[in-house]
């Protein structure tokens, strides 16, 4: 059984993230979507909230599991006894950053492979940062994030303004 880990901040999950999850779920037997708890970032959503949103948008996929981790990705991947990490790429600028991280991971753990998957061209401009900026200015996030979590994101924004 081939299992892959798809790590990320997912703050919040976007249609680009969902595109990678859906396609990975077709290619691999099991996809573990791993939410990074990065204490150096100031996320809009807690790890629990990000997990909840990911569970909401992937509930129809029996082979997708949502998890979270702290620390080095390679340590988490080994803990899960997985040898493949999948990363989504939107543009050449993503490749440069992801390639550097993949090579670092290879140096730390030569037994772990990184596979790059191109995001659907319709999502090539999309990032969690773009979504957060649009929602901060009361813009419409329809088409940027999965429909199931649009209200959740707007409610979070509204609660932060109180």
Curated annotation (Swiss-Prot):
Its EC number is 2.7.7.3. It is found in: Cytoplasm. Substrate binds at residues 9, 41, 73, 87. Keywords: ATP-binding, Coenzyme A biosynthesis, Cytoplasm, Magnesium, Nucleotide-binding, Nucleotidyltransferase, Transferase. SUPFAM superfamilies: Nucleotidylyl transferase. GO terms for molecular function: ATP binding; pantetheine-phosphate adenylyltransferase activity. The record marks 17 as: Transition state stabilizer. One of its GO terms (cellular component) is cytoplasm. InterPro entries: Cyt_trans-like, PPAT, Rossmann-like_a/b/a_fold. Its cofactor is Mg(2+). It catalyses: (R)-4'-phosphopantetheine + ATP + H(+) = 3'-dephospho-CoA + diphosphate. Pfam families: CTP_transf_like. It comes from the Bacteria. Gene3D superfamilies: HUPs. ATP binds at residues 9-10, 17, 88-90, 98, 123-129. It is an enzyme of class 2 (transferase). Disulfide bonds: none annotated. One of its GO terms (biological process) is coenzyme A biosynthetic process. Reversibly transfers an adenylyl group from ATP to 4'-phosphopantetheine, yielding dephospho-CoA (dPCoA) and pyrophosphate. Homohexamer. NCBIfam families: coaD_prev_kdtB (TIGR01510), cyt_tran_rel (TIGR00125). This is Phosphopantetheine adenylyltransferase. It comes from Natranaerobius thermophilus (strain ATCC BAA-1301 / DSM 18059 / JW/NM-WN-LF).
């Amino acid at each position: 059984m081939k299992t892959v880990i798809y790590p990320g901040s997912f703050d919040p999950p976007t249609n680009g993230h969902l595109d990678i999850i859906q396609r990975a779920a077709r290619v691999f037997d099991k996809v573990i979507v791993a939410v990074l708890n990065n204490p150096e970032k100031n996320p809009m959503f807690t790890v629990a909230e990000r997990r909840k949103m990911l569970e909401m948008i992937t509930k129809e996929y029996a082979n997708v599991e949502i998890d979270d981790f702290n620390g080095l990705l390679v340590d988490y991947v080994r803990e899960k006894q997985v040898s493949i990490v999948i990363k989504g790429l939107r543009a050449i600028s993503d490749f440069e950053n992801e390639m550097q991280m993949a090579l670092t991971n290879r140096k730390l753990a030569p037994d772990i492979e990184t596979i790059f998957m191109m995001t659907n061209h319709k999502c090539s401009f999309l990032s969690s940062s773009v979504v957060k900026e649009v929602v901060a200015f009361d813009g419409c996030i329809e088409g940027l994030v999965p429909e199931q979590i649009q209200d959740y994101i707007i409610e979070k924004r509204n609660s932060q303004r109180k």
